[in-house]
Swiss-Prot record:
GO terms for cellular component: chromosome, centromeric region; nucleus. The keyword Transcription regulation applies. The gene is SIR1. InterPro entries: ORC1-binding_dom, Sir1_ORC-binding. The keyword Transcription applies. The lineage of its organism: Eukaryota, Fungi, Dikarya, Ascomycota, Saccharomycotina. This is Regulatory protein SIR1.
Length: 654
């Protein structure tokens, strides 16, 4: 370090204001003001100083590494967040909305901001040389999400999605943490399943945090902070318990701070014990703290082992108390709970790779499926918008029909009050059923629509008549007289076709019928002409998770197959030379369910309009039957498909 005067010094080619602790550009006019002495200015001009303009020219990123540990000991550093893009650039986090490139990594480091005339802003940070130890207070970090880790995904009545991360219950519909010992949650899940899930996963971390005297709780898994979104910067402070001095025991608490002084990142939640202070400037917060620090602050005299010991000791005591309290609640409610629980609970596994790609909330089951399938953000947003429009159409249509039934009792307030109990319950039930239908059908409908487009594009021109009776289309030889595909090697063609016609067939790349013997399941085809001219039969199959059809299992194994997967599909049978039959089906047609979903409402057989001349009790029963019919799974499913076709045709006409 070369001292120019009492204020300025040159450190490894950098001119530094040692009073304000910042680098100064040698070309800046303020340099001459700080060096009124000509000898000092001449001394400075003889130094080999860093050209700031080269920083921007030599780098396509705003974050530039500098190999000078001595420099960073004499300048102020602030904590900033950056994005590493797929094109290799590093940019400041706040301008992400202007980007077209995918964010590969999120990182944070302590750095110093430099303003370059005509070139904008860059941030310099210490770039370590070999065998150098990190500078005190400087450490890069990024949220490190393990893509192979799996988490419990709890689905309640199809439409409510929860995941558990290190004992914290996160509600994906609202991006909100829930206490497990919550009356509304217990009512939503049902007591029996609530108790079972608690014993299996014990998601009581938020309950523990609210019960601690400490205002923090350490978490190792970065995915929780990734999903919770907005984070705050914090540091640990020593305090005396109960605010006393002298012999009072030492205590650690977390305090929000500036990025320059922060040691950890955290997620802040309001203290539920003081809800009235939520809007107060001095409201009390508790913090879920990322265990890994963002800086190694050697200047601080805090011992992190003591901090972790404080939390562990206190949390173990609180955990036992909470477990005992919840067990008591379970025992008391079980004795007096005689009602049958109707809620449908499903527990699956979801990978952190899928959860890490969630871009916005709320999150539905369909969204998770699309992410798992590798669909991009724009495609998922289009599907979500389509789902919202379909749901709106179905709800408006069903609600209008239910309102017409409800209006029947306007003249009888007592009967209307009695009917309203069933009415509002039906509204809740059919909305749940719509969520199930969306999960069952939406992806299939979109897939069939895409297949239809592909089929029309691929096969619209591939037709050639060999004779008035035989047509070649979609890779098949079609017998128009018998309305069926025929084997190109069929001996009958020797008498039905002339030599030049058979030669024409031999030169065409037609499907080889022996290849059909390799398949046990029906074969999906995008063959518009084939299905147009060939006779089709109705056949029952099973629809798999891959949306393809499979042959029905044997009678011995039939009970293991989900009833809701059985579908009825039109197909073209092909008799092979070994007398076995193979089936071809149109992949662009939506198969009809033979049986409703296991969660579906049973369809009523009633129909038609109600007669106002009925006795009040009979009229009430008829209204209930009509309402059950309109909210049945099969009826809502037909409405959903009709709404999809309406939107599809509307877009086509546009």
């Amino acid at each position: 370090m070369l001292q120019i005067n009492s204020r300025l010094a040159v450190i490894d080619g950098w001119l530094v204001d040692t009073v304000k602790r910042k680098p100064i550009n040698f070309r800046s006019p303020e340099v001459r003001l700080l060096l009124p002495n000509d000898d000092d200015y001449k001394k400075l001009s003889q130094q080999n100083l860093v050209d700031w303009t080269r920083l921007k020219k030599d780098s396509n990123s705003v974050l530039v590494g500098v190999k000078s540990m001595e420099l960073f000991k004499h300048i102020k550093l602030v904590l900033r967040e950056f994005f590493l893009l797929e094109d290799g650039r590093i940019i400041l986090k706040r301008i992400r909305s202007k980007l077209r490139y995918k964010v590969v990594k999120k990182l944070t480091c302590k750095c110093c901001r430099l303003n370059l005339p005509k070139w904008g802003t860059v941030y310099i940070h210490p770039m370590l040389k070999d065998k150098e130890k990190p500078l005190a207070g400087v450490c890069e970090f990024s949220l490190d999400v393990n893509p192979d880790r799996e988490y419990p995904l709890i689905e309640i009545n199809v439409s409510h999605q929860y995941i558990i991360i290190e004992g914290f219950l996160l509600y994906l519909n609202e991006r909100r943490l829930y206490r497990w010992n919550d009356n509304n949650l217990r009512s939503q899940v049902g007591l029996t399943k609530w108790a079972h899930l608690r014993k299996t996963y014990n998601p009581v971390s938020l309950d523990i945090l609210y019960s601690l005297n400490s205002n923090f709780y350490f978490v190792k898994d970065d995915l929780l902070f990734q999903l919770l979104g907005k984070r705050v910067f914090v540091k640990f402070c020593k305090v005396m318990e109960n605010g006393k001095c002298g012999k009072a025991p030492l205590w650690y608490r977390v305090k929000r701070t500036t990025t320059a002084k922060a040691t950890h990142i955290a997620y802040a939640i309001s203290n539920s014990t003081a809800p009235d202070s939520f809007k107060s400037k001095n409201n009390d917060y508790r913090f879920i703290v990322r265990e890994k620090p963002i800086v190694e602050n050697t200047i601080s005299n805090l011992d992190y082992s003591d901090i972790k010991k404080q939390q562990f000791t206190e949390a173990e005591v609180v955990k036992r108390k909470i477990s005992a309290d919840i067990s008591q609640i379970e025992n008391v409610h079980t004795q007096f709970n005689s009602q049958k629980e109707k809620n449908n609970i499903r527990v699956n596994k979801v990978s952190s790779e899928v959860l890490d790609q969630i871009s916005k909330f709320p999150v539905s089951r369909v969204t998770l499926l699309l992410i798992s399938a590798g669909q991009d953000k724009n495609y998922i947003e289009l599907v979500e918008e389509l789902a919202r429009r379909l749901e709106k159409i179905c709800i408006e249509k069903t609600t209008q029909s239910l309102e017409e039934i409800r209006d029947t009792f306007q003249a009888n307030p007592e009967m209307q009050a009695r009917f309203d109990k069933e009415y509002y319950q039906s509204i809740e039930e059919y909305k749940i059923t719509l969520e199930l239908i969306k999960e069952d059908l939406l992806i299939t409908l979109i897939k069939q629509m895409e297949n239809m487009w592909a089929a029309e594009k691929k096969f619209s021109t591939e037709e050639e008549y060999v004779s008035p009776r035989f047509l070649v289309a979609d890779g098949f030889l079609i017998d128009l007289a018998e309305e069926k595909p025929i084997n190109p090697k069929d001996p009958r063609l020797l008498t039905l076709l002339k030599d030049h016609q058979r030669a024409m067939i031999d030169q065409m790349n037609l499907v080889k019928w022996n290849d059909f013997k390799k398949y046990q399941d029906p074969i999906p085809l995008k063959a518009k002409t084939l299905f147009k001219f060939c006779k089709q039969i109705k056949k029952k199959f099973l629809r798999g998770a891959d949306f393809k059809l499979h042959t029905l299992p044997t009678e011995a194994n039939l009970k293991y197959e989900p009833e809701r997967m059985t579908v009825s599909c039109s197909c073209v049978p092909i008799l092979l030379d070994d007398q076995t039959v193979q089936y071809l089906y149109d992949d662009s047609i939506i198969p009809e369910f033979e049986a409703t979903s296991s969660y579906a409402t049973k369809q009523s057989k009633c129909g038609g309009k109600m007669s106002l001349q009925m006795e009040p009790d009979l009229l009430f029963q008829e209204a209930i039957r009509r309402m059950r019919h309109l909210t049945a799974y099969d009826v809502l499913r037909r409405n959903y498909i009709a709404a999809f076709e309406e939107l599809y045709m509307g877009n086509c006409n546009d």
